[in-house]
A protein has these predicted regions:
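Acidic, amphipathic alpha-helical patches
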Residues: 67-70, 131
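Acidic donor-binding loop of glycosyltransferase active sites
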Residues: 72-88
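A charged, aromatic-enriched C-terminal amphipathic alpha-helix characteristic of glycosyltransferases
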Residues: 126, 140-176
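Conserved catalytic-core segment of nucleotide-activated headgroup transferases in glycan assembly
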Residues: 1-67
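Short hydrophobic beta-strand element within catalytic cores of glycosyltransferases
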Residues: 102-106
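Short alpha-helix at the nucleotide-sugar/activated-sugar donor binding site of glycosyltransferases
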Residues: 96-98
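Nucleotide-sugar-dependent
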Residues: 83-93, 107, 112-115
């Protein structure tokens, strides 16, 4: 079975850096970092155009998934590439890390390091060479089941709504 590489692909949302992501994937393939004999390439998002990756193959595309389909897919991902030119991490990197995947994302403004959530989240500067190097690191981590699982076990991503909303509920119940 092949490992699963997922790219969060939203070309009509410029903040998602779709075309940089395509360059990163192609460069990683050209440099034999991302070996298509070992990795299945999947694009997930909306309005994904017909594209071919470096070797002329078309990626598998999933568009407009409902939440159940998205959650089911997230649980099968080994490595994700999710770019977002915003100061917040966005949902896909956190969703994928919470599902056990390793994720490469970009730095921006105050978003420099996401280890506070998970050691399976790798941040790199939003430029080709830095992101390709992060893909290299991501592949090494995604294919190391012991390190990847240990990072997942040590995730600081809360799955308990009561815990997550505890402070908010406290403030609201005290002030209102």
């Amino acid at each position: 079975t092949k490992y699963r590489f997922v790219f969060y692909a939203r070309p009509n949302n410029l903040r998602n850096l779709f075309y940089l992501g395509i360059q990163v994937i192609n460069s990683a393939i050209q440099q034999q970092i991302l070996n298509l004999d070992q990795w299945e390439i999947i694009f997930v998002g909306k309005d994904i155009p017909d594209v071919t990756i470096d070797d002329g193959k078309e990626p598998i595309k999933y568009q407009n998934l409902n939440w159940s389909e998205y959650a089911q897919l997230a649980g099968t991902v080994d490595l994700g590439l999710s770019l977002m030119c915003t100061p917040h991490p966005s949902y896909p990197p956190l969703d994928l890390a919470a599902s056990g995947a390793v994720v490469v994302t970009n730095r921006f403004s105050n978003k420099q390091d996401l280890n506070c959530y998970s050691a399976n989240l790798i941040c790199a500067d939003p430029e080709l060479h830095a992101l390709v190097d992060a893909i290299r690191k991501g592949i090494a981590l995604a294919t190391d089941p012991v390190a990847r699982e240990q990072n997942f076990i040590n995730n600081k991503l809360s799955t308990d709504w009561n815990q997550s909303l505890k402070d908010v509920i406290q403030v609201l119940s005290t002030n209102y």
